[in-house]
């Protein structure tokens, strides 16, 4: 049995991986689209397919980060890298209650540190223009619409996790790529509604660093990205448990 300390370190690293590459890709896309980076030949493809093309690219960045994290760290901590997933697994007794808070703390710290390091790499415009990839409802999207989108998106993610990673009958070795592609698809679908967080930690890291370094306060939206994902994950876990019970 891997110690709790080692598992929490793995969760920290995995969530760092997710936010640095995923939210970082979102920030860079915004920076390039708004002229926040110097023109160069490598920028030419950005926006070539319009907004949808950018969401596909961002979704794939998240998807590859998740897949890599699962394959690298899954055997250590289970690679939740998401407080909603941790709570969802706990709700169906697939994760011990005593480890829930340490896991969530590790995930939040990993996300915050990832945003901080990305800011140091990309410069202050990553926060002032790119928002460090922070999520927020898009214009015309109401608070409850956004929460519903996050709930549905996380439900789909969690039902996939239950089927491909938690269920012992699932084929081995496919969890990383299937979960990663699922996240990429969900981001492409609801990205232009909520920014598609599906993960309280993924939103927490950019919010904290945006507030500290850019003076941007988005915390009024934070409940969307906590309540929506947690409700979606718990409902999915309970639904899967019901569907597979004898």
Curated annotation (Swiss-Prot):
Identify the residue ranges that face the Extracellular compartment according to the record: 33-45, 91-103, 167-172, 239-246
List where the protein spans the membrane: 12-32, 46-66, 70-90, 104-124, 146-166, 173-193, 218-238
NPA 1: where is this motif?
A: 82-84
Can you tell me which family this protein belongs to?
A: Belongs to the MIP/aquaporin (TC 1.A.8) family.
Annotated protein name in UniProt: Aquaporin AqpM
Give its localization.
Cell membrane
Motif, NPA 2: chain positions: 199-201
Protein keywords: Cell membrane, Membrane, Repeat, Transmembrane, Transmembrane helix, Transport
Q: What NCBIfam families does UniProt report for this protein, alphabetically?
A: MIP
Q: What is known of its domains?
A: Aquaporins contain two tandem repeats each containing three membrane-spanning domains and a pore-forming loop with the signature motif Asn-Pro-Ala (NPA).
**Key word Transport present:** yes
Summarizing the function annotation, the protein's role is: Channel that permits osmotically driven movement of water in both directions. It mediates rapid entry or exit of water in response to abrupt changes in osmolarity. Also exhibits a transient but reproducible increase in the initial glycerol flux.
Citing just one GO molecular function, the answer is: water channel activity
| Name of the gene encoding the protein in the UniProt record | aqpM
A Gene Ontology cellular-component term: plasma membrane
The record's InterPro entries line, in alphabetical order, gives: Aquaporin-like, Aquaporin_transptr, MIP, MIP_CS
* Bilayer topology annotation: Multi-pass membrane protein
Q: Which domain of life is it from?
A: Archaea
> What quaternary arrangement does the UniProt entry report?
Homotetramer.
């Amino acid at each position: 049995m891997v110690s709790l300390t080692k598992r929490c370190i793995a969760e920290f690293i995995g969530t760092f991986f997710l936010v640095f590459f995923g939210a970082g890709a979102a920030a860079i896309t915004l920076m390039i689209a708004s002229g926040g980076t110097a023109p160069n030949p490598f920028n030419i493809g950005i926006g070539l397919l319009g907004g949808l093309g950018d969401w596909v690219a961002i979704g794939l960045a998240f998807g590859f980060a998740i897949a890599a994290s699962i394959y690298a760290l899954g055997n250590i901590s289970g690679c939740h890298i998401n407080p909603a997933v941790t709570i969802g697994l706990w709700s169906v007794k697939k994760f011990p209650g005593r480890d829930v808070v340490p896991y969530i703390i590790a995930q939040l710290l990993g996300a915050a540190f990832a945003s901080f390091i990305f800011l140091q790499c990309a410069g202050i415009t990553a926060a002032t223009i790119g928002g460090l990839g922070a999520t927020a409802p898009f214009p015309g999207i109401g608070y409850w619409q956004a929460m519903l989108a996050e709930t549905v998106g996380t439900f789909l993610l969690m039902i996939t996790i239950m089927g491909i990673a938690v269920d012992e009958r699932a084929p081995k070795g496919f969890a990383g790529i299937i979960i990663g592609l699922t996240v990429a698809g969900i981001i492409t679908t609801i990205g232009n509604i909520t920014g598609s967080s599906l993960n309280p930690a993924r939103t927490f890291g950019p919010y904290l660093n945006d507030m500290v370094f850019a003076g941007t306060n988005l915390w009024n939206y934070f409940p969307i990205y906590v309540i929506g994902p947690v409700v979606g994950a718990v409902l999915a876990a309970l639904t899967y448990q019901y569907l597979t019970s004898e």
